[in-house]
Amino acid sequence: MARINYSINGDPETTSKAMGSELHISPKKSREVCCKIKGMKASEARKFLEDVIAMKQAVPFKKHHDGSGHRKGPMAAGKYPISASKEILKVLKNAESNAEYKGLEPANMYIIHAAIQRGRVIHGFMPRARGRATPKDTETVNIEMILSEVR
């Protein structure tokens, strides 16, 4: 596995970082979730992700929205990416724990950076009839999140 660095570096005294490596979630869905929570307070983002997991609130899809239906609220196309939201919530909780360990106040922190990068592809094959095989690849995602006290 290659060494993965953060895209940006903030002030180490006022920021906390967390990263999730090679998570088995969709890159397209995780991109849309990260775009939505970027700029939110950490507590608001946690509530939003928990509502998405419970299918109470949809995530607006702005780029990858073919075949998506209209949802309630100020959005056109939206979906409920449950598995991506669960993994991003884990990374957010990790970033809050890192902030608490550093002596920062997690309740007052904003998400200044939430980004995904495509990870490696896990190649696999599915056996088919008559001795054939169909490729079945699993995409992975690297998520990085940076919280800051000042906005």
From Swiss-Prot:
Q: Does the keyword Ribonucleoprotein apply?
A: yes
Q: According to the UniProt record, where is the region Disordered?
A: 1-23
Keyword Cytoplasm listed: no
* UniProt GO cellular component terms: cytosolic large ribosomal subunit
Which CDD domains does this one have? Ribosomal_L22
Q: Which GO terms describe its biological process?
A: cytoplasmic translation
Taxonomically, the superkingdom here is Archaea
Comp. bias intervals (Polar residues)? 1-18
Pfam families hit by this protein: Ribosomal_L22 (PF00237)
One annotated GO molecular function: structural constituent of ribosome
* UniProt entry keywords in alphabetical sequence: Ribonucleoprotein, Ribosomal protein, RNA-binding, rRNA-binding
Subunit record text: Part of the 50S ribosomal subunit.
Question: What is the annotated role of this protein in its UniProt record?
Answer: This protein binds specifically to 23S rRNA. It makes multiple contacts with different domains of the 23S rRNA in the assembled 50S subunit and ribosome.
Q: Which NCBIfam families match?
A: PRK04223.1, uL22_arch_euk
| Descriptive protein name | Large ribosomal subunit protein uL22
Q: Whose protein is this, by species?
A: Methanosarcina acetivorans (strain ATCC 35395 / DSM 2834 / JCM 12185 / C2A)
